[in-house]
From Swiss-Prot:
UniProt-recorded name of the protein: Imidazoleglycerol-phosphate dehydratase
GO biological process, one term: L-histidine biosynthetic process
Gene: hisB
Gene3D superfamilies tied to this protein: Imidazole glycerol phosphate dehydratase, domain 1
Organism (species): Geotalea uraniireducens (strain Rf4)
InterPro entries to which the protein is assigned, alphabetical: IGPD_sf, ImidazoleglycerolP_deHydtase, ImidazoleglycerP_deHydtase_CS, Ribosomal_Su5_D2-typ_SF
Alphabetic keyword roster: Amino-acid biosynthesis, Cytoplasm, Histidine biosynthesis, Lyase
Length: 195
């Protein structure tokens, strides 16, 4: 079974085309006009072993908010579509990732119930032109559209770049684990019989 998706989203604010292969090798081609987000999505693909292509244009002359949030929406939709009925997947994943002085942990449940817990303290600063508060908007949009329960916790860290990079890497590794198919699982990993 091919676990791939291609999603296109066109609004008055953004134009996004995204293709995803869950069972990839970590190849990425990302061009969002938001350099820091490009960096995060490239490492997300690499560390999750997802093949990911993203082309995005947005009203970045205003700010990056719409573009960042809409990419989160589309990535969530693509993951959900590629997983289909979730037959045989592990459902749960978790990863703890160090990045120099930072330690971040992510746990995910592909339950069909969207809920984000975001314990990440960041000063209101920019990395380049990227407002770091937009990271939460991205994760919330991803969570809602994937319909997943996502917990992101940063135990400690000082460098804002390192904090967000550790979060994206931990998310990638947790999703890689949760989306893996296990031959021991008949149907879905739920006593209800549906996720």
């Amino acid at each position: 079974m091919s676990r791939k998706a291609v999603i296109e989203r066109i609004t008055k604010e953004t134009q996004i085309k995204l293709s995803l292969n869950i069972d990839g090798s970590g190849e990425a081609r990302v061009c969002t006009s938001v350099p820091f987000l490009d960096h995060m999505l490239n490492l997300f693909a690499r560390h999750g072993l997802f093949d990911l292509e993203v082309e995005a244009k947005g009203d970045i002359d205003i700010d990056f908010h719409h573009t960042v949030e809409d990419i989160g929406i589309v990535l969530g939709e693509a993951l959900k579509q590629a997983l289909g009925d979730k037959q045989g997947i592990r459902r749960y994943g978790q990863a703890t990732v160090p990045m120099d002085e930072t330690l971040a942990s992510v746990a995910v449940d592909l339950s069909g119930r969207p809920y984000l817990v975001y314990n990440v303290r960041l000063p209101k600063v920019k990395i380049g032109e990227f407002d770091v508060e937009l990271a939460r908007e991205f994760f919330q949009a991803l969570t809602n559209n994937l319909a997943a329960n996502l917990h992101i916790n940063v135990m400690y860290g000082d460098n804002v770049h390192h904090i967000l990079e550790a979060c994206f890497k931990a998310l990638a590794r947790a999703l890689d684990q949760a989306t893996q198919q296990d031959p021991r699982i008949a149907g879905v990993m739920s006593t209800k019989g549906k996720l």
